[in-house]
Design a protein with these regions (language model features):
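Sec-dependent N-terminal signal peptides
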Residues: 1-24
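Well-ordered beta-sheet/strand-loop patches within structured domains
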Residues: 2, 47, 123, 130, ...
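Positively charged, low-complexity intrinsically disordered regions
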Residues: 5, 23, 29-32, 300, ...
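Peripheral peptide segments
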Residues: 22-25, 29-34, 457-462
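Hydrophobic residues in alpha-helical segments
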Residues: 136, 168-169
Length: 462
């Protein structure tokens, strides 16, 4: 046992991911070459989607709006000619941001400017500004084209269109106000640079760059002081710190295409569970006969309980063969998706790693979980090593939460974030509906905030 503790402690220290608990304003020198991780400020409260309805069988269905989405209410304000000209100049160059000038009625705005101040100019300029602000802030892609999209973006609440237009007109700085809406992540800037250097004749590549730039706009602009972001097609998870600096990457195994595809989420790490248990889904207990088999011949590592209705509950106990491995990073959500260790570590060596039932198996999950617990629960490394090696179920709640983004980018920087833009296989075929929406005229925005697809919670999320 002491040898195992020493090995885990050594692995954790060498990884460079361990961080001594300290005040956020002071950075202590480190002896390891890994980047220093600063303690985050408390994460902003997430915006929660409406409660999910259920199917007739009682299984929860996620992503069906309770009310019909309505068109957004766009303001109309008085526009001086000079500010309208500044808006037109932005529209004329907006293709550098991966959008289309024609979407924002430049010819109508040009004609209204020529006619001079008045209601016509106010109406046209207000509409053009609102549409442009919405697309720069929230993305051009309509919700119906965002497959399995359940990451509610709060930016329209933080920077509403009315406030943006008021600011632009009060400061007479239309271009500056709109520029503040662009994503700040380095991947967005790398894609923007790639778009600028890709020949116009290469329409397929330019279209792919555009939709992946737009995917960054789907996410909240402020991703957090410290956050985790998984890119499903890349099979990678990144731990990021202030100003989008890369701390460490982790290989992942994600959901198989089809019903068990991993959805796109924005959640928070709320706890780290050492030596987790796993409640075996009924599809295995009943469908594969595991419950009856264990009743006939009990097996070490499984606890079977007969319920009052005669059904069986099977719980796999903590241990080296537990399906969740030695650690689970809990990010509560209606989909039962989380990050976890796995005893099947051979999958991390495969180039294509879409093998799970939805959850994200994470290489070196113990290192990641300990890092989260040190930063989020102020626990000393020695205690965490003891938790990990005890073999006992131990849940460590976070006093500081960390955002987790489960994203889907088919183009972006390479894994090391060196600035080189690479493509990833569209394993779930989610590009097609976004590309189709970009090939059509811009759709009017509605109040819908997530995908309307019915998604039944997976009964076996591993």
């Amino acid at each position: 046992m002491e040898l195992r503790k020493a090995l885990i402690a050594g692995m954790f220290a060498v990884s460079g991911a361990a961080v001594a608990a300290q005040p956020a304003t002071t950075a202590q020198p480190r002896r390891t070459p890994a980047p220093e991780v600063l303690l985050p400020a408390p994460a902003p409260a997430p915006i929660v989607a409406p409660p999910a309805p259920t199917t007739k069988s009682g299984a929860p269905v996620i992503g069906i709006p309770e009310v019909q989405p309505l068109p957004v209410n766009e303001p109309v304000m008085a526009w001086p000619v000079a500010d309208a000209r500044a808006l037109l100049a932005v529209i004329d160059t907006i293709e550098s941001e991966g959008l289309f000038s024609k979407d924002y009625q430049p010819e109508a705005l040009r004609a209204a400017i020529a006619a001079g101040p008045g209601q016509a100019l106010d109406a046209v300029a207000s509409k053009s500004f609102a549409w442009l602000a919405e697309d720069l802030r929230d993305g051009r892609t309509p919700m119906e084209s965002r497959v399995q999209w359940f990451a509610v973006d709060p930016d329209q609440d933080v920077t509403p269109t009315t406030g943006l237009m008021t600011k632009a007109l009060a400061t007479h700085n239309v271009a500056g106000t709109l520029a503040e809406l662009a994503p700040t992540h380095p991947d967005y800037q790398a894609l923007k640079a790639a778009l600028a250097t890709t020949p116009r004749a290469d329409t397929a590549t330019r279209s792919k760059i555009r939709i992946n730039m737009d995917r960054w706009r789907w996410l909240r602009r402020d991703l957090g002081e410290i956050y985790l972001i998984a890119n499903v097609p890349e099979y990678q998870l990144r731990l990021m710190k202030a100003n989008h600096q890369l701390v460490k990457t982790f290989r992942t195994v994600v959901g198989k295409p089809g019903r068990t595809a991993t959805p796109q989420l924005a959640e928070e790490v709320k706890a780290v569970v050492f030596n987790p248990t796993w409640t075996v889904p009924q599809s295995i207990v009943v469908g594969e006969g595991l419950g009856a088999s264990l009743m006939r011949a009990p097996r070490k590592g499984y606890k079977v309980t007969r319920n009052s209705d005669g059904s069986l509950t099977v719980v796999q106990q903590p241990g080296p063969s537990n399906s969740l491995g030695v650690i689970k990073i809990d990010m509560p959500n209606p989909h039962a998706i989380y990050l976890h260790d796995t005893p099947a570590k051979q999958y991390f060596n495969q180039p294509i790693r879409a093998e799970s039932h939805g959850c994200i198996r994470t290489q070196n999950a113990l290192v990641l979980g300990m890092t989260m617990a040190i930063m989020g629960a102020d626990m000393p490394q020695e205690q965490l090593v003891a938790n990990a090696t005890s073999g006992k179920y131990t849940k460590v709640p976070m006093t500081r939460t960390f955002p987790v983004y489960i994203s889907y980018f088919t183009m972006g920087q390479d894994t090391g974030m060196t600035g080189r833009v690479v493509s990833y296989a569209d394993i779930y075929r989610r590009d097609a509906p976004v590309l189709a929406s970009f090939a059509k005229a811009r759709e009017l925005k509605t109040t819908q905030r997530i995908s309307s697809e019915p998604v039944i919670q997976l009964d076996n999320p591993l």
